[in-house]
Amino acid sequence: MSALTPPTDMPTPTTDKITQAAMETIYLCKFRVSMDGEWLCLRELDDISLTPDPEPTHEDPNYLMANERMNLMNMAKLSIKGLIESALNLGRTLDSDYAPLQQFFVVMEHCLKHGLKAKKTFLGQNKSFWGPLELVEKLVPEAAEITASVKDLPGLKTPVGRGRAWLRLALMQKKLSEYMKALINKKELLSEFYEPNALMMEEEGAIIAGLLVGLNVIDANFCMKGEDLDSQVGVIDFSMYLKDGNSSKGTEGDGQITAILDQKNYVEELNRHLNATVNNLQAKVDALEKSNTKLTGELAVANNRIITLQEEMERVKEESSYILESNRKGPKQDRTAEGQALSEARKHLKEETQLRLDVEKELEMQISMRQEMELAMKMLEKDVCEKQDALVSLRQQLDDLRALKHELAFKLQSSDLGVKQKSELNSRLEEKTNQMAATIKQLEQSEKDLVKQAKTLNSAANKLIPKHH
């Protein structure tokens, strides 16, 4: 990657200002943000210069704005995907201290600020995304509640703080995607706050609003009374998305741990559902026992009443037989009255007998239902025990995998240390080899000199021998 500032003999104030401005917008203009699988890639653009040329060339503003929109959209994709995956793996309600959630709000803030028109005030120009968010309550009546809540928060003093609080409340309400879609569909209202080529006015804004639907599966809870939203600095942390070269070593072990964690969470959720079902069945059994007790009491009362009616019937039969005997000699009119009384008594007895049969039938149904509920409870308790055993086994496997991962990491560190020692030994051997090669060269040179001297002495000796002869 090339340096941000080219070497110059003497830095000038103009060069420093231009370099500083370029460094502040480096993530939007100097690089193109793209995704490689699940990772973030920053690619340098060769056609952007950070120092003024002798004859400055004007960059196309539409191209730069389109590049910024694409970068912000890719960052939003990565942030939303990472937030959903980490939240589901975490398996609990998120709070304001959760790092992926903080980065998501920072990315959303940058998206809402892109192409924002500056408002002139007494203190100068001011850019705030609180104005567009206030429009949502006019488009979606449900948003009026969170807008009023934001305005009532005592610790918020700036429009930026109100906008940040609004985003957090909308996420808690699980309506952020709906609100953003309603806002983006009203571009005639957004044109008052944004430039024509801003992210909220283009297709990238609609894509981000669609991606926000996935956040409805996340449960978040924020306490904004003690949180300083006015003075927070919204800086995107690229280190959360950049790919680490050494991260692929433990991918397989991490994948196994993730799979076991998913199984563990599934079994725990299933166990909670089974416990809830057992509690519901227990409540139904209790209600059936109370109903059974009540019906048993009613049956006893009905039996007593039937016995009383049978005794009364016997007494009426005796009286009727006595009356018949006595009325054989009496007037015919008295016999007719006694017959009517007897028929009424028989009718009353028939009704009471039918009532008793109905009560006994209902009691038998309640008893059979109770037996079925007890059988279902036993089966559910057996299923719960099996799931708990499976959960214990999965936890043991998770502990074993974690121990294996630590052992592999220790072995990897040991192997790295051994490789380092071998490389140092190799370098020392190479150094000794070079020294020995130099020594051999010196010895060869000395040998050549000795051979030369021997030849000289031999020739001198040959010259001296003839002279003696």
Swiss-Prot record:
Residues 271-362, 422-463 form a coiled coil. Keywords: Cell junction, Cell projection, Coiled coil, Cytoplasm, Developmental protein, Differentiation, Lysosome, Membrane, Neurogenesis, Oncogene, Phosphoprotein. The modification Phosphoserine is found at residues 34, 49. It is found in: Cytoplasm; Endomembrane system; Cell projection, Invadopodium; Cell projection, Growth cone. InterPro entries: RUFY1-3 (IPR047335), Run_dom (IPR004012), Run_dom_sf (IPR037213), RUN_RUFY3 (IPR047334). GO terms for biological process: actin filament organization; cell differentiation; negative regulation of axonogenesis; nervous system development; positive regulation of axon extension; positive regulation of cell migration; positive regulation of intracellular protein transport; positive regulation of retrograde axon cargo transport. GO terms for molecular function: dynactin binding. Residues 95-227 form the RUN domain. SUPFAM superfamilies: RUN domain-like (SSF140741). Phosphorylated by PAK1. Pfam families: RUN. The keyword Coiled coil applies. The modification Phosphothreonine is found at residues 5, 12, 51. ARL8 effector that promotes the coupling of endolysosomes to dynein-dynactin for retrograde transport along microtubules. Acts by binding both GTP-bound ARL8 and dynein-dynactin. In nonneuronal cells, promotes concentration of endolysosomes in the juxtanuclear area. In hippocampal neurons, drives retrograde transport of endolysosomes from the axon to the soma. Plays a role in the generation of neuronal polarity formation and axon growth. Implicated in the formation of a single axon by developing neurons. The second coiled coil domain is involved in the interaction with GTP-bound ARL8B. Interacts with PAK1. Interacts (via C-terminus) with Ras-related Rab-5 proteins. Interacts (via C-terminus) with Ras-related Rap-2 proteins. Interacts with PIK3CA and PIK3R1. Interacts (via N-terminus) with FSCN1; this interaction induces neuron axon development. Interacts with DBN1. Interacts (via the second coiled coil) with GTP-, but not GDP-bound ARL8A and ARL8B. Interacts with dynactin/DCTN1 and the dynein intermediate chain DYNC1I1/2. Directly interacts with DYNC1LI1. This is Protein RUFY3.
